[in-house]
Amino acid sequence: MAGEGEEDVPRDAKIVKSLLKSMGVEDYEPRVIHQFLELWYRYVVEVLTDAQVYSEHASKPNIDCDDVKLAIQSKVNFSFSQPPPREVLLELAASRNKIPLPKSIAGPGVPLPPEQDTLLSPNYQLVIPKKSVSTEPEETEDDEEMTDPGQSSQEQQQQQQQTSDLPSQTPQRVSFPLSRRPK
């Protein structure tokens, strides 16, 4: 990203470009320089504002180098978190690794969730209402064998009507997976 309009670029932008180049960054968008400049200016303003507060607290007429150092140090301490020392991390890792892992109940392989919770299971249902027959159903041999000879014909008709009405009241639910389309 070098070359075009190099003489029109402000000094701060040239410094940012040289910093990027020294870090090994050769290809970047022009907006990157503007974003770094904005971050840089904002950081400097915050540090100088804090230095001015420290200077006023010390009843000094001007900001001096010690105020700026104190402001930078307070920014570093409170803005950027320092990782714990390596020894502390090793000690924490050793104490954590002493606890054995729980034994696996499942067999070998990857345990899968129940089928109803997977994306491969059918997630739809079709409701197929059963058509009610308006005419009297024909009696079959099975129906004749099941009838009690002691019942009157009227009681038999009521019993048949009740048995034929039950399946029509409950809809039948059907679910099936979609098959792949032939290519």
Curated annotation (Swiss-Prot):
GO CC, alphabetical: nucleus
Limits of the Histone-fold domain: 10-77
Main subcellular location of this protein, as a coarse class: nucleus
Stored SUPFAM superfamilies: Histone-fold (SSF47113)
Gene Ontology molecular functions: protein heterodimerization activity
Keywords tagged on the record: Acetylation, Activator, Nucleus, Transcription, Transcription regulation
Compartment annotation: Nucleus
Positions with biased composition (Acidic residues): 136-147
GO annotation terms (biological process): DNA-templated transcription initiation
Region (Disordered), start-end ranges: 101-183
Modified residue annotations for N-acetylalanine: 2
Membrane-spanning intervals of the chain: none
Compositionally biased spans, kind Low complexity: 148-172
Tissues showing expression: Expressed in roots, leaves and inflorescences.
Subunit structure and binding partners: Component of the TFIID complex. TFIID is composed of TATA binding protein (TBP) and a number of TBP-associated factors (TAFs) whose MWs range from 14-217 kDa. Interacts with TAF4B, TAF5, TAF6B and TAF10.
Protein family (similarity comment): Belongs to the TAF9 family.
Known function: TAFs are components of the transcription factor IID (TFIID) complex that is essential for mediating regulation of RNA polymerase transcription.
Protein known as: Transcription initiation factor TFIID subunit 9
Biological source species: Arabidopsis thaliana
Annotated gene: TAF9
